[in-house]
């Protein structure tokens, strides 16, 4: 199905109401790459899960099977990353079709929101593509992801995100970690002035989350809170590193620690 057909299909749809105000107390969103990680996030007290696949490469859209099982078992809000491939955030018409189909799956399964982002070749928000994706999402909440960090002008991107009606934007302040980008994040929080939630992410941990809160003024934080899980050694082939190796999973104790710190540091 072509991009134009999608425009015709969804142009008349209503997004529904979305809340964009800052919460008074601080909360934690956990990026989860598996069913086990999502359940650990919930057990640890996270306020929301962002479900994705391939966290090591910035995250991709999870499989339908993973999404269906997590939706059935999770009782806290579930947002789903919609990203069909790694690399940049300039998407083709075919990739747009894939993203629309993935968003429709989220709607059918009763997810609470989606995490989106699309840029044009000039590094500006692709407003046309974003409007179509948001229309397909209907009443689901929308987070604009870290495409803002590679956009031409983060301040202008923030205004576009607000104009689109997104609930929040995830950002590292254009740096490798949120701590390195804290000054830029603080500027975005001030610019947003409560019109959208600015959520720091990338390298957020128990060792820096309170510093980030003080330096940025943010009230929502995004972390994976992962630990390495040792793989079972099932055969005499230890040198095949791409098969059967160790893997990461959300650590419930790390989630609890982050949640506890944010609760203690609440203003």
Curated annotation (Swiss-Prot):
Provide the protein's localization. Answer: Cytoplasm
The terms under GO molecular function for this entry are:
copper ion binding
One matching Pfam family is CutC
Keywords associated with the record:
Cytoplasm
Would you tell me the Gene Ontology cellular component terms? cytoplasm
The answer to keyword Secreted applying to this record is no
The keyword Cytoplasm is assigned to this record: yes
Q: Report the sequence similarity comment from the record.
A: Belongs to the CutC family.
UniProt name for this protein: PF03932 family protein CutC
Q: Which organism is it from?
A: Xylella fastidiosa (strain 9a5c)
